[in-house]
Amino acid sequence: MSRKIVLITGANRGLGRNAAVKLAAKGRDIIFTYRTHQHEAQDVIREIERAGGRAVALKLDVGDLSQFDCFISEVKNALQQHWQRETFDYLVNNAGQGHYKLFSETTEAEFDALMNVHFKGPYFLTQKLLPAIADGGRILNISSGLTRLTYPGSGTYASMKGAMEVLTRYQAKELGERRIRVNILAPGAIETDFGGGRVRDDKAVNDTIAAFTALGRVGLPDDIGDAVCAILSDETGWITAQRIEASGGQAL
């Protein structure tokens, strides 16, 4: 049986990197994107290969829709060259950027940048990739616990993620005839460099969040990588149109 192929955006660092390596260890091959830091992407390729997978890294800024047509061609070429296939199996819309600024202070330019990366970009990238996603495949969008929780300064970012949660349900309904399952994973606070590394590096922030989390700590990249693997496993094929939060019970 041929290995399943996963396309993950934004996997040269953080949660995407962790998920890519864990998926490779579970028998998946990986196409992943990076926006900058090509050396990090090469490191990820080596990690994936050590985990037993095959990997291809492609440069892409998800917030720049003018790059999409060229990117689609590169994906098709990679599929033919490395797997002799025309389709891949799973898409993970992971790429993103943090933003902490009050509603009253957020500029139109900042709003547009977040919209492009977190909603408009994934919307049209997924649309353009549909012919290359195998029937019976999966789409996993990445949201945030901030669509349920309310922290001043996170409203613009959370609004874009909320839009993705609504879109997920519609994608699941409309793509069901192709047996494509679509779900969305909402991580809670995680120790990564995302958003300047606040949760990881600021002990006061870390301790505060841990204090009102049921499991008594903030999340680690492994927690989310394991969740991605579970949602994309063969055993979860009857799950679609669901928001799945992985937060350790944050702010119950």
Language-model features: locations:
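Conserved glycine-rich Rossmann-like NAD(P)H-binding loop of the short-chain dehydrogenase/reductase
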Residues: 28-43
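Conserved glycine-rich cofactor-binding loop
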Residues: 12-13
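Residue(s) in the substrate-gating loop at a strand-loop-helix junction
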Residues: 144
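Substrate-binding pocket helix/loop in short-chain dehydrogenase/reductase
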Residues: 102-103, 107-115, 205, 209
